């Protein structure tokens, strides 16, 4: 666990991290305490000048996270993140590339997060296709994962790898090539800290292809998971139960899970919301005892039916706290992944999610509404805090009635 300890020793501030990430968290905590926003780069938030800083020497602080793996998913990036990156800081690759990912990874550490699902729309170059990206994951000690199976980025990588489109992305008809596709990524990633998504869906966020009827789909997924576990064993060496894995029962996959799909006990069940920030299903008492634990994939942005919301972030801290506190109380403590869309519209709400992931008791549902004022005060100063908080609270109230896109 990436924890840190701070204390004074002979008039020196000592920060000890349980891991390199823990040390980074401790250093960035000092930065936070003296008024530096985690978004100092992303939002140009300049800290207020301080002529003097004081540090009390009468206490030792130890901090550790409530949730083990916590991070963000860049998604639906075509209209903002992608064109911005390729026209500004990543002109060399003309895509979301290492300069963008370096800033995202620093932001994750500043927010005490540790996990990244990189952008994966069809026009976004796959994270693992650039050596510079991979070096960043090591440099910043970020745990890499993906919403696509086995660390792949299907929309960018599958056609380039296979020469086929969605028609070839069926384990029922093309198991040998798909197995090779997954195995090559597992081998490539063996020296990196990573969490593997197991199971399978079709391309373009659709159901599994090539299996007619629920019974056939269950049998097919069972074969798929067995093949993936063998890849993990062969490519990473040793016991697959020691390699972090998640299964995400998203959309139709939840129906299949509830119909009896068996997931190995060491795999984290990453439950889902309904795309609008309300959790669909909580783990049972038996599921909470799984050795792999439980997690949540949560949306602050969504592109799809019946209603998209990517222009403005509309999920209030009160709703987030109610749902994620409920998740935590029901055993979802291993993995929290937040879909932030292009990030910019959801910066404040994502910061709130990571505040909860670090200390789930910091913003309980009954006081979460005060986060807007706390955020406004630390970002813009006390003179503007009340007015800005009122504006944000009214925004959340109106957005709860109707999304801006509608």
What function would you assign to each model-found segment?
Residues 19, 72, 112, 269, ...:
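Conserved, mostly hydrophobic/aromatic
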Residues 156, 204-210, 291-317:
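Active-site clefts of carbohydrate-active enzymes
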Residues 93-122, 132, 136-147, 191, ...:
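Catalytic domains of carbohydrate-active enzymes, especially glycoside hydrolases
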Residues 49-50, 372-406:
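C-terminal non-catalytic alpha-helical accessory regions
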């Amino acid at each position: 666990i990436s924890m840190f300890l701070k204390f004074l020793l002979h008039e020196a501030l000592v920060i000890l991290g349980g891991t390199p990430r823990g040390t980074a968290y401790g250093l960035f905590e000092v930065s936070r305490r003296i008024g530096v926003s985690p978004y100092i780069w992303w939002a140009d938030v300049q800290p207020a000048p301080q002529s003097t800083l004081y540090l009390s020497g009468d206490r030792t602080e130890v901090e550790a996270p409530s949730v083990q793996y916590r991070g963000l998913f860049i998604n639906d990036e075509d209209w903002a993140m992608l064109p911005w990156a390729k026209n500004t800081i990543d002109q060399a690759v003309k895509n979301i590339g290492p300069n963008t990912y370096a800033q995202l990874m620093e932001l994750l550490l500043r927010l005490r997060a540790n996990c990244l699902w990189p952008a994966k729309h069809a026009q976004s170059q796959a994270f693992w296709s650039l050596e510079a990206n991979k070096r960043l994951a090591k440099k910043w000690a970020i745990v890499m994962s993906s919403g696509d199976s086995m660390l792949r980025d299907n929309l960018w990588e599958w056609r380039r790898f296979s020469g086929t489109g969605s028609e070839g992305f069926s384990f029922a008809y093309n198991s040998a090539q798909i197995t090779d596709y997954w195995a090559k990524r597992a081998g490539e990633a063996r020296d990196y800290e990573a969490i593997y998504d197991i199971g399978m869906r079709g391309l373009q966020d659709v159901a599994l292809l090539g299996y007619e009827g629920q019974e056939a789909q269950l049998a097919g997924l069972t074969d798929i998971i067995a093949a993936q576990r063998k890849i993990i064993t062969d490519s990473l060496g040793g016991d697959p139960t020691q390699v972090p894995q998640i299964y995400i029962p998203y959309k139709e996959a939840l129906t299949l899970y509830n119909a009896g799909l068996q997931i190995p006990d060491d795999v984290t069940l990453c439950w889902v919301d309904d795309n609008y920030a309300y959790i669909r299903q909580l783990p049972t008492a038996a599921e909470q005892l799984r050795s792999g634990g439980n997690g949540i994939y949560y949306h602050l942005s969504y592109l799809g039916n019946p209603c998209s919301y990517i222009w403005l972030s509309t999920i209030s801290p009160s709703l987030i706290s109610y749902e994620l506190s409920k998740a935590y109380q029901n055993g979802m403590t291993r993995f929290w992944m937040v879909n932030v869309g292009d990030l910019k519209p959801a910066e404040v709400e994502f910061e709130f999610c990571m505040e909860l992931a670090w200390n789930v008791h910091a913003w309980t549902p009954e006081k979460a509404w005060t986060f807007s004022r706390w955020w406004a005060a630390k970002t813009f100063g006390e003179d503007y805090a009340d007015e800005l908080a009122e504006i944000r609270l009214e925004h959340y109230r109106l957005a709860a009635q109707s999304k801006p896109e509608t």
